[in-house]
Amino acid sequence: DKEFSMPDNFYDDYEGRPAAAAQTMSIAKDMDIIYDTKMYREGMKSRLKKAYGRKIKRLTPEDRVAYDAVYDSITDVFFRENPQGKELVEWKYQRFMRDYAKVVKSLDDNVGRVLDYLEKAGLLDNTLVVYTSDQGFYMGEHGWFDKRFMYEESMRTPLVMCLPKGFQKRGDIPELVQNIDYAPTFLELAGVSVPSDIQGVSLLPLLKGESPADWRTS
């Protein structure tokens, strides 16, 4: 497994930021050893053990076999080495990042499958494919995981588009866009009138390579 570099502020002391210090998404304090890192042996206790059990029960028998094939060996090593203190905190970070990276890899593979299907079906030139999310996620910055604190890392969201034929724009778009812009974009692209009470702005000018002078800056 890959060894991930830790963010420079992983051991943030939150000096002068009492709200940040009081958050409940610390890798050290709040990352549940059973629920979040999936390390479980019979008889173990944790705050989220029951929630973990409910999730495991949702797996099909085939999925459970595949799940155990991955995590049984990792769990064996974890209990044999028995990390404590700072070593445990950094182990949790690595486990979290490795799981996250594998999820992202699976997403990437399956986005590729969708694009391959659209191309084979002759639909790719007439389809807008959008990959996005509802919020960002902490990847160890400030010693955090999860997303529930309004710092830069969780404010930003991914937005990647595969454009239909006729749109020449490629690469990064530097203008500030928001998720409220998606609905008017889709409506305009489909040739539907955008209701006056929609708050967002269509992204089509940006996707066409234009730079409107009155585009938002904040």
Question: Which residues does each PLM region occupy?
Answer:
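Generic recognition of well-ordered alpha-helical segments
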Residues: 156, 178-189, 202, 206
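Short, solvent-exposed polar/charged micro-motifs at secondary-structure junctions
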Residues: 20, 205-209
